[in-house]
Regions:
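Positively charged n-region of N-terminal signal peptides that target proteins for export
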Residues: 2-11
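Small-residue packing motifs within transmembrane alpha-helices
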Residues: 7, 16-17, 181
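Intrinsically disordered, low-complexity repeat segments enriched in small/polar residues
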Residues: 11-12, 335
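Bacterial N-terminal signal peptides
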Residues: 12-22
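Kelch-like beta-propeller repeat domains
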Residues: 26-378
Length: 378
């Protein structure tokens, strides 16, 4: 059941988030463009007194944020609706202007079908949307190589260079506000360990040092400075039944300062809580932390029913990896109304923003949630 008192508290916190100016932390998987310096300091317009949920329940939606000049925009791309079937997957897209406080439909993602498992990131003054997979009415699936660049200022899309090895359910991060990293994921041929790097200036791809652990998809993480951290996800089951099981491995990668394709990988100790799948993950340059919330310990395809045939439910554990101390930190081991089936987490100065997702009982939600970054008082 929904804790309405807690939801009221979250609503109040969200209002404070917008009124305070919503200075978005430098974060991954969504990096922000730097505003041009105005002649005189300019303040954001006052925020609306109420923040709406998404227009429709949506899960497995790619999310990102972008700040251009003094305007902060949050985005939700594609995803799966309440029916949790292939025909409930949509190519609709929405943006939220912090000064308005509600969601507006933007130009749909180009293509004949919607996708899930896609990755999104803001770079400079554009949003980039990568890969994902289509679910056909007959039951088949196909991972696509599509890369779309969206210009918020003109509400239009452009096609960018295809992903060399098409992937879905990868970890995404942005380096030096130019290079987008796709870490692992699954392709049409199976789960991959590739790290693929996209240069937004040259519209070109290169391959970086692969991940040394098991190939995984549905893992979570972020890129802060020159450091990538990812956790868990699903890996192929050697016994074959079920086909995929949760991976409990956590890894940190350091990008070579002189060669962006070289990554030194180090295995990390286990994080708080059990191994999980489709956690919401994202990092903060300001905090020097990578945050994680929700997810489930029972991997599934898209409807919330595990590969083992059992229903999946979200985990209540919220935690982070502190890049200064190189240690895991528990924020809340009993987060109210947890969610799963996420493709990213937006980090702000005031908290962690989750957009949509799947609640307990595999219920798709339109809820927009703000979680505290501070550890829960004992």
């Amino acid at each position: 059941m929904v804790d309405w008192e807690n939801m009221k508290t979250l609503s109040v916190l969200f209002v404070l988030l917008f009124v305070s100016g919503l200075l978005l932390a430098q974060s991954t998987p969504q990096q922000q463009s730097q505003p041009q310096s105005p002649a005189q300091p300019q303040q954001p317009p006052p925020a609306k007194s109420q923040v709406d949920p998404l227009p429709d329940p949506i899960s497995n939606n790619a999310v990102a944020a972008l700040r251009v000049h003094w305007q902060l925009l949050l985005f939700s791309f594609m995803g799966m609706g309440a029916k949790k079937t292939g025909d409930a997957i949509t190519n609709t897209a929405f943006s939220l202007d912090a000064t308005e406080g509600n969601w507006s439909a933007i130009h749909p993602v180009p293509g004949t079908a919607g996708r899930i498992g896609a990755m999104a990131a803001g770079v400079r003054d554009q949003l980039y949307l990568f890969g994902g997979y289509v679910v056909y009415a007959q039951g088949g699936e196909m991972v696509v190589p599509d890369v779309g660049a969206y210009q918020p200022s003109h509400d239009r899309w452009f096609r960018s260079a295809d992903i060399p090895k098409p992937v879905a359910d990868s970890v995404i991060g942005v380096y030096r506000d130019r290079y987008v990293y796709l870490v692992g994921g699954r392709s049409n041929a199976g789960v991959v360990n590739n790290v693929q790097v996209y240069d937004v200036e040259k519209d070109m791809w290169s391959q970086a040092t692969p991940i040394p652990g098991p190939a995984v998809f549905g893992h979570a993480g972020g890129l802060v400075g020159e450091t990538i951290v990812y956790v868990d996800g699903a890996r192929e089951n050697p016994s074959g039944n079920p086909k995929y099981v949760a991976s409990d491995e956590c890894w940190m990668g350091k990008i070579d300062h002189h060669d962006r394709t070289k990554i030194q990988w180090t295995k990390l100790p286990s994080h708080p809580g059990t191994a999980r799948y489709r956690i919401a993950g994202g990092g903060s340059e300001t905090d020097q932390k990578i945050y994680f919330a929700g997810g489930t310990d029972n991997p599934y395809d898209y409807n919330g029913i595990g590969f083992d045939g059992k229903p999946s439910d979200p985990s209540p554990v919220t935690f982070d990896f502190n890049l200064r101390t190189k240690k895991w930190e528990t924020i809340n081991d009993n987060t109210p109304d947890p969610t799963m089936d996420h493709r990213g987490l937006l980090v702000t100065h005031e908290g962690l923003v989750l957009i949509g997702g799947m609640e307990t009982g595999q219920k798709v939600t339109a809820r927009v949630t703000l979680l505290s970054k501070e550890p829960k008082a004992k």
